[in-house]
């Protein structure tokens, strides 16, 4: 999820300047971010379209929530234009990770595989 090297296209130019800055992460952080993404995102149960982005539903699991929190912290460093929200639903309900933002962010996210 969240592939960072994108070809610049007319569509992306129209969306605005959304690009992830991988240099915001040091080598160790980048490696950890990649490991977390590869481990976590196959575990999502649902992708839900939102007015300004996407929501990803995960099973309720304490270690999964902790790992998603770590991933979101690293993601925010390189993609500060994203609003990332983690939510635990009541009564042991699922975890929701929401990736949202200003106009154009949803189109940017839509380019990701699996969305």
Where are each of the predicted segments found?
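A common structural junction motif
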Residues: 73-82, 113-115
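Amphipathic, interaction-prone secondary-structure segments
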Residues: 65-69, 73
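Secretory/periplasmic and organellar redox-cofactor proteins
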Residues: 1-66, 85-115
